[in-house]
Amino acid sequence: MRVLRLSLPFALFIIVFLFISCTSTKFSTLWKDETYQGHPEKILVINAFLNPANRRIFEDEFVKELKDRRIDAVVSYTSMPDPVVSDKDAIAAQAKRVGVDTVLINRPIGTTTRETAGFTTYQDLYINTQIDVYDMKSNRLILSATAETWIRQDIPYPIHIKSYVKDVVQRLLQQGLF
């Protein structure tokens, strides 16, 4: 019985620690057009990261998260080559071609490195991103956010992408975008 009393608080501590450590994305700014009254019906998801594999993993994961919430979405990589993901005219043409009313663009805006001291000193890497959501019917920006995501070196990059996508979708839901 004594072992149970000692191990229960420890188990609760571990659960809380794991829950907190899973949320590695912090949103530093978020702006939403309060006059926007619509709800996206079909979203074109564009990831402007330079690495083609990361672009595809991100877009696939984002579309999956949206579809799990019954929101129609499509990836851009199947019909937009990597170099044109930052070309506004190409994006508008692609949006029209695939029949979307909303475009979500995720792009890197920099990295930050911070030293953490403990028993040993190590560096934490943070990727800073910008998420912009456009209403294609009115051709205007309806949401813009910047985020910072902690990248642990011992965790595979696709796991970071999945966690980041969940955090972004959750934040967009909280903002009433979907």
Locate each region found by the language model.
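Soluble non-cytosolic domains of exported or imported proteins
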Residues: 49-60, 82-89, 128, 154-163
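Sec-dependent bacterial lipoprotein signal peptides
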Residues: 1-22
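Surface-exposed short loop/turn segments
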Residues: 86-140
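A generic structural signal for short, solvent-exposed coil/turn residues
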Residues: 11-14, 37, 65, 123
